């Protein structure tokens, strides 16, 4: 009995100092309320102007991807930056220009810009209304 208890305590001590990698939650997953994710901030990557960020996936435990919504207010832009993964910018509303490796393409509601690993990308709002985007990309691979 004492040996069994000692073995159990040893296992618990090892688990305490070297926890197993987290697993995704079981069941329905995680539901995020958009209203809980809103942050008014300057756009990333040295962009100009002001934006509203909806950092939707930030609170998801052990996530493998980033999923965000961003409203670029009139005159705002996400600055040019290199990407180390594929990214998708889906236009929910408004108008803008997406730049990928120096090529500028006008986008509007319903358009999706698929941007490739290694590209230098950015986006700017044009027109009178906010440019509202859904942005999705993978995070670094988990080592489970």
Q: What is the predicted role of each segment?
A:
Residues 61, 117-142:
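Ligand-binding loop in jelly-roll beta-barrel domains
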Residues 103-118:
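Short acidic-glycine-tyrosine-enriched beta hairpin
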């Amino acid at each position: 009995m004492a040996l069994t208890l000692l073995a159990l305590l040893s296992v618990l001590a090892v688990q305490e100092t070297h926890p197993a990698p987290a697993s995704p939650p079981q069941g329905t997953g995680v539901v995020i309320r958009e209203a809980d994710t809103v942050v008014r901030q300057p756009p990333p990557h040295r962009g100009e102007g002001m934006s509203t960020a909806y950092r939707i996936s930030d609170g998801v435990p052990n996530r493998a991807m980033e999923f965000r919504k961003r409203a670029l207010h009139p005159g705002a832009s996400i600055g040019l930056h290199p990407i180390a993964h594929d990214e998708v910018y889906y236009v929910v509303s408004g108008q803008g220009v997406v730049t990928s490796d120096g090529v500028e393409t006008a986008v509007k509601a319903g358009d999706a810009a698929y941007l490739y690993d290694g590209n230098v990308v950015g986006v700017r709002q044009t027109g009178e209304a906010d440019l509202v985007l859904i942005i999705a990309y993978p995070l670094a691979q988990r080592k489970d």
